């Protein structure tokens, strides 16, 4: 490699495309790819994707899809039997990050029960003798599910396997997703001293056992349930061992620490545990919650909180349960503000109703205000938009009780306090959002006030509704034009009733029959009320007319006072306006007029009747003397002699008259321009 050349390291596909964790389509594609590849080890980026998907999908998929938080275990396997090969708690905690699902869709929860059965058949179809396969001359590890099957099957005798197959047939009809009791309640035997010694011995024995290199331990959340015909001592040891495993596995994997699998053999045990649960509810309930680490906040927000459901029974439970509930909230991380605003918490309605009843009985308004202030300070402040739109249970009932019980002054004070405590919303939201009780308040104000004060009260209401902040006059004017004024429609309806017809008249056609009396003329169409108001305003005169002159005698009269306004004109633009093509036309016009006058002066004596008579007399009596100049100019060499050429021209043609010569001189036909 050249010294200046750096090794080319391509960005991992998972880092370049972070949406991989949020796309179910990629899960389906990876499932198809795993089917094409066959059995083989998981790629590192796929394992990391499974880890990241556990954090992302936990709160989004809900309780109905929890195969991500609850790892996949083959059907018919007992958790106690699998725990024998899984190692100690330390190793279990380190290796629980690697899921045993053979493809990504199992971690995403995209595979249903049929797909799970198909995967098990595919895994069990491989003979157990094939502990490993050789690919390209090297030893390649098997898939995790197959390795777990081989590891668990190696320590069993054929009798146990046969019993397992029968257990599979029994458990196929079992409800897989019944809501679980806590693991403390499922395994009450952990509290006994004999079981603690058995747990210590079993943990020491399992921690020393080593795992095979390619194996990946499977985790479970189901609580162990044994048959009633087994020995009591074996049942206790195995139950304590299973409880130990379940207490370790959910904490390390970050899943729900409650079982999701209900077994048919536990029906009798649960009946016995209910009595123990009722007696020790105050002590046992906060135990698993306080000991378990903090779960994901999105899952917590969607789970049913047992402490919230039990708050309705606070008086019956006593002080011990209150102490237990006080210890629970610090371990629960607060969810986001958006989830708190939208997620329904069981017990909210009952709590608010109880608070309202206690407040009505005791009439302690100050205590209620202090409680509201504490609640508002404890809960994180949500967005203004969410607070204005999200419905909070108890709003309508509280406002109705306040209106019925308190006086008007108390209402004003309480509204001022609530407006001071709550963050001010935008003017747009306050103008458009409906606040319960507005209509009733406005109707009462209109009934109480007199008719002469209606306009003032409506204007005040319009300002209060449209302008929460008095520092914005532009917004006030804008919202006053668009806001709803409760008295406007009633005024227009009354005026329309007085007018005669509230609705526009239909289109009418008149047919005139000759010889009959024509129908009476229709009433002229009347404009709507708003247009009539608009026309009334400009009709009002702006100034009073002169009282001396009557309206009918008005004529156009000029004022005696004349005002002269001087127009300032610059010399440059005025001179430029004179220039143009019309200047040359004006010069030509003047020259032509001058020449016409000159020709008229010369030709006027020739056009008199006396001059014309003389000219005709000359033409009738031509002179007999020949004109030598004209005969010399005629050509004689080229053309033979003819009688026409020898004949002398007449005097009129040969000798021009004086008048024609004078006219030619006067016209100046030489071609020169004047």
Curated annotation (Swiss-Prot):
Record lineage: Eukaryota, Metazoa, Chordata, Craniata, Vertebrata
Protein's recorded name: Protein phosphatase 1 regulatory subunit 15A
One GO term (biological process): protein localization to endoplasmic reticulum
Cellular-component GO terms for this entry: cytoplasm; cytosol; endoplasmic reticulum; endoplasmic reticulum membrane; Golgi apparatus; membrane; mitochondrial outer membrane; mitochondrion
Effect of residue 614 to K: Reduces PP1-binding
Effect of residue 618 to D: Reduces PP1-binding
Function: Recruits the serine/threonine-protein phosphatase PPP1CA to prevents excessive phosphorylation of the translation initiation factor eIF-2A/EIF2S1, thereby reversing the shut-off of protein synthesis initiated by stress-inducible kinases and facilitating recovery of cells from stress. Down-regulates the TGF-beta signaling pathway by promoting dephosphorylation of TGFB1 by PP1. May promote apoptosis by inducing p53/TP53 phosphorylation on 'Ser-15'. Plays an essential role in autophagy by tuning translation during starvation, thus enabling lysosomal biogenesis and a sustained autophagic flux. (Microbial infection) Promotes enterovirus 71 replication by mediating the internal ribosome entry site (IRES) activity of viral 5'-UTR.
Induction context: Specifically produced in response to stress: in absence of stress, some upstream open reading frame (uORF) of this transcript is translated, thereby preventing its translation. By methyl methanesulfonate and ionizing irradiation. By IL24/interleukin-24 in melanoma cells; which induces apoptosis. By viral infection including enterovirus 71/EV71 or HIV-1.
């Amino acid at each position: 490699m050249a010294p200046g050349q750096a090794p080319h390291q391509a960005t991992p596909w998972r880092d370049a495309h972070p949406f991989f964790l949020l796309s179910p389509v990629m899960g389906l594609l990876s499932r198809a790819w795993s089917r094409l590849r066959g059995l083989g080890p998981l790629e590192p980026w796929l394992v990391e994707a499974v880890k990241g998907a556990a954090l992302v999908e936990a709160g989004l998929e809900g309780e109905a899809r929890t195969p991500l938080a609850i790892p996949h275990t083959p059907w018919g396997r007992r958790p106690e039997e699998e725990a024998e090969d899984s190692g100690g708690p330390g190793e279990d905690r380190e290796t629980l990050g690697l899921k045993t699902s053979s493809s990504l869709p199992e971690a995403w929860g995209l595979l249903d029960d049929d797909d799970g059965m198909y995967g098990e058949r595919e895994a069990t179809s491989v003979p157990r003798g094939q502990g490993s396969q050789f690919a390209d001359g090297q030893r390649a590890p098997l898939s995790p599910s197959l390795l777990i099957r081989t590891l668990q099957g190696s320590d069993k005798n054929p009798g146990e396997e046969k019993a397992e197959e029968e257990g599979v047939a029994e458990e196929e009809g079992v409800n897989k997703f019944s809501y679980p009791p806590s693991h403390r309640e499922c395994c009450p035997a952990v509290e006994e001293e004999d079981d603690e010694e058995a747990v210590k011995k079993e943990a020491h024995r399992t921690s020393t056992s080593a795992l095979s290199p390619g194996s990946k331990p499977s985790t479970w959340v189901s609580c162990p349930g044994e048959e009633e015909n087994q020995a009591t001592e074996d049942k206790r040891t195995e139950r304590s061992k299973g409880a130990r495993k379940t207490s370790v596995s959910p904490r390390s994997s970050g899943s729900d620490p409650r079982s999701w699998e209900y077994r048919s053999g536990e029906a009798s045990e649960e009946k016995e545990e209910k009595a123990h649960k009722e007696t020790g509810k105050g002590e046992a309930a906060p135990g698993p919650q306080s000991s378990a680490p903090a779960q994901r906040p999105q899952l917590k927000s969607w789970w049913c909180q047992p402490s919230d459901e039990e708050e309705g029974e606070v008086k019956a439970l006593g002080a011990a349960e209150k102490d237990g509930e006080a210890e629970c909230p610090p371990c629960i991380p607060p969810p986001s503000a958006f989830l708190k605003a939208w997620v329904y918490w069981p017990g909210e309605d009952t709590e608010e109703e109880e608070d309202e009843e206690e407040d009505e009985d005791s009439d302690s308004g100050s205590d209620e205000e202090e409680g509201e202030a504490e609640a508002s300070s404890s809960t994180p402040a949500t967005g203004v938009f969410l607070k204005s739109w999200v419905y909070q249970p108890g709003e309508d009932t509280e406002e109705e009780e306040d209106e019925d019980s308190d006086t008007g002054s108390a209402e004003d004070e309480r509204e001022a306090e609530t407006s001071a405590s709550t963050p001010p919303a935008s003017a747009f939201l306050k103008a458009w959002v409906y606040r319960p009780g507005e209509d009733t308040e406005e109707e009462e104000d209109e009934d109480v006030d007199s008719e002469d004060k209606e306009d003032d009260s409506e204007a005040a209401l319009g300002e209060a509704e449209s302008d929460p902040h008095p520092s914005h006059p532009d917004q006030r004017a804008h919202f006053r034009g668009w806001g709803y004024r409760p008295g406007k429609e009633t005024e227009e309806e009354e005026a329309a009733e007085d007018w005669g017809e509230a609705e526009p008249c239909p289109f009418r056609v008149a047919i005139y029959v000759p010889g009959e009396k024509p129908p009476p003329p229709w009433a002229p169409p009347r404009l709507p009320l708003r247009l009539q108001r608009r026309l009334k305003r400009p009709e009002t005169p702006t100034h009073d007319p002169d009282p001396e002159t009557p309206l009918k005698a008005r004529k156009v009269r000029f004022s005696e006072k004349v005002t002269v306004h001087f127009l300032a004109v610059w010399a440059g633009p005025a001179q430029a306006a004179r220039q143009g093509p019309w200047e040359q036309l004006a010069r030509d016009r003047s020259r032509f007029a001058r020449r016409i006058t000159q020709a008229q002066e010369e030709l006027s004596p020739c056009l008199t009747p006396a001059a014309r008579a003389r000219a005709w007399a000359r033409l009738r009596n031509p002179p007999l003397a020949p004109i030598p100049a004209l005969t010399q100019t005629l050509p004689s060499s080229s053309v033979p002699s003819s009688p026409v050429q020898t004949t002398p021209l007449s005097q009129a043609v040969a000798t021009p008259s004086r008048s024609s010569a004078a006219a030619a001189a006067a016209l100046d036909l030489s071609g020169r321009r004047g």
